[in-house]
């Protein structure tokens, strides 16, 4: 019985083995046809992608696609013309639909319809040439810094920027916003050096030094309930998002600034009521807190971006700046006057010393004349 079962299995497997052997023979003959260049040329049919890519075709003479004799010439021509294969029935090339190009060229196995080249990528752009995709999520990187490294290929939305204040060096600083409103120039063109080159000179609590910037400030102190005049009382544009259904941003409500900018998830009401300061304000609108530490930024540059809400002390005193364009300090003026007085005194002494030899001969000659007259 064992021999009968073996013979039956061999009889059953023989057609499969013969078919497999015939397929291998056909494959070998196809390779030979590929070497000889005897693949069928079917003009009017799409090119065989596998043949164009490898130079071989497993279907041989039964392949229904075209097999050009010089496939390298076909590849070069397609690159020059920018043509891509149309393979009806195959999935469409997503990269081709988005950009209108395909790095695989004629060897791509997907369909490239000519009337849909770059149709998905034809979207409107904002003022910075980034794509506007209303149905997609906002690009967090673009909202945070105002740029996007992916450019036109980014799949997220890039909303229009409502203000150029996002590009300032110190975001949310009322000083830079005030400078923009006064000069009419973009605030980001003001560097720290150019602003501090000729700062206001604070002299005495009873008044403020007159100068080119004197019109921006008022003299005297301000009570806690009064609104200070100066840089910090000037209006500025609100560039933070308003989200009515969300909680209010506590940092924004307290200081008027928000480090997260347009990506903050909290509400930033435009009509924010500034709480009255809990201390006396100086003539430039900065808080005087004698028991608190000195504001480092104010001590260096004479300004403070937090304004009346700063928790440090901003005393009124004379600032000395190491800048040629800055106003000279009283100590330097006194030193210059002392030097001038010393030079004048030395000049007078030297002139008197030089005058003595000229006067002595005259006196001597007069005495000699008197003596001669007596004799």
From Swiss-Prot:
Keywords: DNA-binding, Metal-binding, Nucleus, Repeat, Zinc, Zinc-finger. It is found in: Nucleus. A zinc finger (C3H1-type) spans 42-70, 87-115, 133-161, 243-271, 289-317. GO terms for cellular component: nucleus. It comes from the Eukaryota. SUPFAM superfamilies: CCCH zinc finger. Residues 352-375 are annotated as: Disordered. InterPro entries: Plant_ZF_CCCH (IPR050974), Znf_CCCH (IPR000571), Znf_CCCH_sf (IPR036855). GO terms for molecular function: DNA binding; mRNA binding; nuclease activity; zinc ion binding. Signal peptide: none annotated. Its main location: nucleus. PANTHER family: PROTEIN PHOSPHATASE RELATED, ZINC FINGER CCCH DOMAIN-CONTAINING PROTEIN 33-RELATED. This is Zinc finger CCCH domain-containing protein 57. It comes from Arabidopsis thaliana (Mouse-ear cress).
């Amino acid at each position: 019985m064992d021999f009968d079962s073996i013979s039956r299995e061999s009889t059953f497997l023989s057609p499969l083995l013969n078919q497999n052997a015939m397929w291998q023979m056909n494959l070998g003959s196809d390779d030979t046809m590929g070497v000889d260049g005897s693949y069928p040329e079917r003009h009017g049919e799409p090119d065989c992608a596998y043949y164009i890519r490898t130079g071989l075709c497993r279907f041989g003479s039964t392949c229904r696609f075209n097999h050009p004799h010089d496939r390298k010439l076909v590849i070069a021509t397609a690159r020059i013309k920018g043509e891509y294969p149309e393979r009806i029935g195959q999935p469409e090339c997503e990269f081709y639909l988005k950009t209108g190009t395909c790095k695989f060229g004629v060897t791509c196995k997907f369909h490239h319809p000519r009337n849909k080249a770059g149709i998905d990528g034809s979207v409107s752009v904002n003022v910075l040439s980034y794509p506007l995709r209303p149905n997609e999520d906002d690009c967090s990187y673009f909202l945070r810094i105002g740029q996007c490294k992916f450019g036109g290929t980014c799949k997220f939305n890039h909303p229009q920027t409502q203000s150029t204040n996002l590009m300032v060096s110190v975001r949310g600083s009322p000083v830079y916003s005030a400078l923009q409103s006064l000069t009419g120039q973009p605030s980001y063109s003001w560097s720290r050096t150019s602003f501090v080159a000729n700062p206001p000179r604070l002299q005495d609590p009873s008044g403020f030094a007159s100068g080119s910037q004197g019109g921006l400030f008022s003299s005297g102190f301000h009570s806690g309930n009064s609104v200070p005049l100066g840089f910090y009382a000037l209006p500025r544009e609100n560039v933070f998002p308003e989200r009515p259904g969300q909680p209010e941003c506590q940092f924004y409500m307290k200081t008027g600034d928000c480090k997260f900018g347009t990506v903050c998830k909290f509400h930033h009401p435009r009509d924010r009521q500034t709480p009255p300061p809990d201390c006396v304000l100086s003539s430039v609108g900065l808080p005087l807190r004698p028991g608190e530490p000195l504001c480092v930024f104010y001590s260096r540059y004479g300004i403070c971006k937090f304004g009346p809400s700063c928790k440090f002390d901003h005393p009124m005193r004379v600032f000395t700046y190491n800048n040629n364009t800055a106003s000279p300090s009283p100590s330097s003026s006194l030193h210059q006057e002392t030097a001038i007085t010393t030079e004048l005194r030395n000049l007078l002494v030297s002139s008197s010393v030089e005058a003595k030899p000229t006067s002595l001969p005259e006196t001597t000659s007069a005495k000699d004349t008197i003596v001669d007259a007596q004799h």
